[in-house]
Amino acid sequence: MSNTTMRDDAIAIWTAGVEAVKPQQLIRSSVRCEGQVMTIDHQKIDLSQIRKIAVVGAGKASAAMAESLETALGDDLLKEKKVHGWINVPADCMRPLKKIHLHAARPASVNEPTEDGVYGAKKILQIVSQCCQEDLVICLISGGGSALLPCPVEAITLSEKQRVTRFLSASGANINELNTVRKRLSLVKGGQLAIASKAGLLVSLIISDVIGDPLDIIASGLTAEDKGNFQDARDVLDKFSAGPEEVSASLLEFISHKASEENSFRPEFPGNVFNHVIGNNMVASAAAHEGSGPRRFPANRSCR
């Protein structure tokens, strides 16, 4: 086999994998609308029972997801169902859409939460909390959603949250440990976005950037039930010896106080929430294998 042929094969394999997980392709293959029936994966939704559709979310791929969702719905449903919404995205993903507002939640080169992100997160909370039982919320979640949708609890400032995130990252904390702490400091993470929704139905379309697709970890589990607690967060901080010199004293006090109240009331997670992972590395690797063409190179696919 010549070097040119090997190069062409490698490009074809890589391209097939990338194309398969582009947001536009994933929405096209996952969302179908026929008359008043909307199908998301294998879930059918009777839109004749839906008054309004609100679309919210965050992530680096969520702008393209929103654009493709508008296309899937079509102009008639966009108008009839009063489709509206708000998506927090990086500044370089901004584009005009028909009904869904895209909000620049951070500069393209900054992968940290910003005050602009907090503003957008509060808008999203307002939208879902103003829905009613006859409404449908569609949440579009993709990689980077955690940093793009910051909404600190009242006792903690954004700068304090940034400080503990930087400290843990520099100390070698993994994504699970980071999110364990961040979820306890947020009004939207750890399933709280879903809890805040007053809609009769919430459906999330998720592009996973985490091995194994753990719903409570992807974008810090915006619409996934969270089994963690404040003691878990305190354990992470203790593991990395986080003291007042490393993170704020008020943050440590907040975590410790909440951990001591762990048996206090915890809101029940709603039963009308459905999460669909429409894209992940398995989709990409399967398409890449198919992209090898008639040669069908031996493949060793691992997502562990």
Predicted feature locations:
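N-terminal loops that bind phosphate or other acidic moieties
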Residues: M1-R304
